Amino acid sequence: MRAKWKKKRMRRLKRKRRKMRQRSK
């Protein structure tokens, strides 16, 4: 069960990181 929400959270974190990187550049 924990792995399921963890995978979903990881995907969201990755998307947020991409946006942050674009803002940095």
UniProtKB/Swiss-Prot annotation:
InterPro entries: Ribosomal_eS32 (IPR007836). It comes from the Eukaryota. Keywords: Ribonucleoprotein, Ribosomal protein. The keyword Metal-binding does not apply. One of its GO terms (cellular component) is ribosome. Coiled coil: none annotated. Initially thought to be part of the large ribosomal subunit. Crystal structures show eS32/eL41 to be a small ribosomal subunit forming a bridge at the interface of the 2 subunits. Component of the small ribosomal subunit (SSU). This is Small ribosomal subunit protein eS32 eS32z/eS32y/eS32x/eS32w/eS32v.
